[in-house]
Amino acid sequence: MYGGLGAHVLALTQAQARRGHEVAVITQAKPGDAGSHVNSNGVEVIRVANHYPDAQMVHERFANWVHGFALASQTACELMSRKPEIVHGHDWIAAGQLNVAAKQFSVPSVLTVHATEFGRHNGWLTSRLSQTIYANERRAVQSADSVIVCSEHMTHEIRCGYGVEPKNLNVIANAVSPLLSIAQRTTHNSENIVVGFIGRLEWEKGVHHIIDAMELIIDERVKLEIVGTGSQLANLQEKVQRKRLGDRVSFLGHIEDRDRAEIVQSWNLAVIPSSYEPFGIVALELGQVGVPIIASQVGGLRDIISSSEFGYLIGEISGGSIARGIESILSNQTLAIKKADRLRSRVEAEFTWDSVVDLTNSVYEKVSA
């Protein structure tokens, strides 16, 4: 399991196990590993070896990888300690084995959609790979007995882009685990004013817009820290050098989860300029720490920062709009901290794994009735 989807499945299944549910997870082993069958924090985990371990985003290789995972998962179903009462898959890659398991055990199937190819490209599916992914996604959501999405925006995306009936759609927001410890935010003593970004360095995440904003901000004390890696790293670094911002923009690379809160806490504000964000888990992670947020008014970000009480939303994603947002926060940091504190309280109260388990159980009960 990788990325945000893997983190979601890990947290959800462990929360379900703590409630007394018997949970088994079938996932792929690391490339080269033979597979394993273990109990991890109350969750039965079956990792299967894929005979096509190369998951490069090339059409033929990627299709083979997905097919190999489906074949391996069929055998893994027979290893489960008990017959399941329901099967739950995450995203279209798991759809093949989800359907096989549902038929094999004669039980209902639930599919959680974390993002879609249709939404990622605004419906413009020009490459063969995108068209293949879209076709698989469409089959997946239409064959599942019930579909879970993470935001109100995603219900529109699934209905319009994939033809799923509203009665089969359920909105369950994501969640974050409580921080083990975090010091109270204090006034920044540094002369620098730090703007932060954390996430994958991909085009849809909009980091290039923050770099454009830095060029427009005259105050040399304003610095940008970029946390994360991705396919756009080299392009972004070249953009920084071209704009002669090397002394004001730092690329920190990948930061382990346990160290992120400390880094984020040192920021004066954070920017989430995504053009596509089905949910926006990063807004919860930033909100949990209490850092003021500027976010684009897209997808699930609108559900989290639902009003100006909790942060700053920008309609037009551009360097100019981000620069104006940064200057607005810096002109009244007391107000910005109040908004951040309200968001932190909301995250702690509403976006919990206990709530996700309760809502997921309701879907299970409805689809099993």
Region roles according to the model:
Residues M1-V45, A369:
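N-terminal subdomain of nucleotide-sugar transferases
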Residues H188-M214:
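Conserved donor-binding/catalytic core segment of Leloir-type glycosyltransferases
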Residues S275:
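Aromatic "clamp/platform" in nucleotide-sugar-dependent glycosyltransferases that forms part
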Residues S307-S308, Y312-G319, S328-Q333:
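Conserved acidic donor-binding segment of nucleotide-sugar-dependent glycosyltransferases
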Residues H153, A175:
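Carbohydrate-associated surface elements
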